[in-house]
Amino acid sequence: MRNFTHSLFLLLFLTASSSVFGQITIAEARLLGANANVTFRGVITNGSELGLIRYIQDATGGLAIYSSNFAGQLNRGDSVEISGTIVDYNGLFELNPVTASNPFGLTTLPNPQVVTPLQLNEDLESELVRLNGVVFADGGNTFAGNTSYTFTQGAEQATIYVRNGSPLIGQIIPVGSIDLVGICSQYNAIYQVLARDTNDFIVPPGINIISTININNLQTNGATISWETDLAGTTEVTYGLTPLLELGTLSDNNPVTAHSFTLNTLLPGQIYYVQASSSLNGDTSSSSIQVFGTQSLSAGWIKSYFNHDVDTTNGSTLPELAQINMLDDSLIAYINRAEQTLDLTIYDFDNASISSVSDAINAAYNRGVRVRFISDGNQAATNLGTLDLLPAIPQLLSPVGGNFTIMHNKFVVIDADHEDPNKPIVWTGSTNWTDRQINRDPNNVIIFQDQTLARTYKLEFEEMWGSTNENADTTVSRFGFEKQDNTPHEFVIGGKRVECYFSPSDNTNQELIKTLLTANDSVQFATMLITRYDIANAIDTLIANGVIVSGLIDDATSTTVFTQISASMGNQLFVNPDTNIIMHHKFFVVDAETENDPIVWTGSHNWSSNANTKNDENTLVVHDAEVADWYRRAYFRLTHPVIPDSTVGILHLESTSAVQVFPTLVNQPSAIQLVSSSNEPASIQLTDMQGKILYNGKLNLKKGQTLSLSMLPNVADGLYLVSVRTSNSIFSKKIQVVN
């Protein structure tokens, strides 16, 4: 849409040249703007492959047409006279409603204008364009619906958008340099190309890469890069520690169509950039630049914590998975480990009623740790925890307004570049840093000790930060739709395969569906919401194939997708009945009870279009039987709670309490203190996690007065439950004893 100040001369000219419904050019129609009733003649440049919308073009310009009544009559190549009203739909001028359509038969399509990505603008809106020599970042993968794909032309980049129902869905994304034809469209000030079908991808003559670039066999000193070409040619790999590929090119001149090259002189725990090429008779086909990380020398352990009970049946060797009312203390303990660097991102942050995370961050800064902090700009007024940070700590708010939505990450990167590979830590998951999220809403945290993954998260952080030093640079920082798919996705951590995806650049939803569909026996999911029909379709496909699917969502009324999956899942679909809490998990488990590649999917990414295409999110996928068992146990306890249950859960939850017990991490229970908001007698009990009573006594609560629980006995290291009972309530809190 253009904003024009129409001069009196222009208005008089247009009025004189045509009546309101007299035939005018498309350029003249666009000048009249929204709400104008117009009639013009042009050529339809697309058919049903783009859905109901049609685009029409004449020698002066183009316009979109949206009409369920006339769409079936308008096909690619039709010459038509059309009448209707111009509207502004999210920045795109389109005719809606259409009042008349008069066909004049088939004609030749206009020649597309040859442009570059930066030239996609208002002047080309709704017109056919051609961009020569573009390379898709996701080349070799397959197209999915309702998804944008980035392509580059030299230093410039833009996107194509593939709608649901497009004939491109399931087709291979072109690899290497091609010429792209499509319609220049706009959505909320973002100009994009709409490719109609595979004929819009023009492959140059000569040798061409025809497969994805596979990077596998990750080792501490290298990896194997493989691809295929349509003709036999050379095998060339150009690589480096930066996108400049400064380490040079290695090649094998033996002509083959199945190419494989192993790099074996690389450094452990490093991120590398690589480009594959094949040449024949002077022609060269090159891939986009790919990113991968070598295996690190880290110990490679993985831990998960839940702020609610988990099923402990036959789990005598389980780690302490349930960290009820303790995730804040655990986070602080990890922050306290930082020796050199600490990068933090958080969506929602308030220290009220939790241990002060800000104090731990400040302490890290005061002991010489470089601290960088990113939070969501939309939450600036309520993220009170950021106000508790030292003024010297650099902070960056994500941009707001326009096409930006939310920075929804909740990750922490500790000592990513430490010379000791056993120091780097990544903390992430679904948990925000607030009382509600830590102590009430069901959530999880997953922690990795791995240098390659830590450097990957640092790379993502610095894309948003805009620099590699302590000062953010907003002139080059990228959030949301601006971000690029520029991080490794495959890792080997402690011998386990791990995948990592960041939204919205990495098309996480496509990976989610792909991972779901690997299930052979069972899937359990716990997710706050599902608003995408392609995920619902995947669930239906699994059930039709005999996979047992069980799921838990927060709210059945928030999406019509619920109607679809409830029909196929029946009583295996659970809904959070407690409106006082949010079932905030975003995880699923695949084949946890079999040997068929057990998988856990978790992170901050909700199962929605905004999460996939707009929000800043992160996702981890762990292929491991033990980790899958942890999440299966968490899911089972959420959907089959123990009654009575005085901890965070779905069917019973302590949402408010007149009693506070602190701290939750002590060397002995006698160090615990208690504060009450009422004056009344109470009983106090200390039990172990098997229910054995270790202490049972009485005390008098005093409003606002801190009471010492010095009467509690000494115990061995482990988890225990402190319960306080009054005449009308029971309060319980887990504590951890560590000597």
Give short role names for the model-derived ranges.
Residues 21, 242, 653-739:
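C-terminal outer-membrane/trafficking sorting elements
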Residues 23-206, 374, 379:
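OB-fold single-stranded nucleic acid-binding module
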Residues 174, 263-271, 713-717:
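Surface-exposed, short loops/turns at beta-strand junctions within beta-sandwich domains
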Residues 38-40, 129, 221-225, 668-672:
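Structural beta-strand segments of beta-rich domains
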Residues 205-295:
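Short, surface-exposed linear motifs at loops/turns and structural transition points
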Residues 24-26, 206-215, 655-661:
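Proline-enriched interdomain boundary motifs that mark the N-terminal boundary
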Residues 296-336, 350-515, 552-620, 624-625:
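HKD-type phospholipase D/PLD-like phosphodiesterase module
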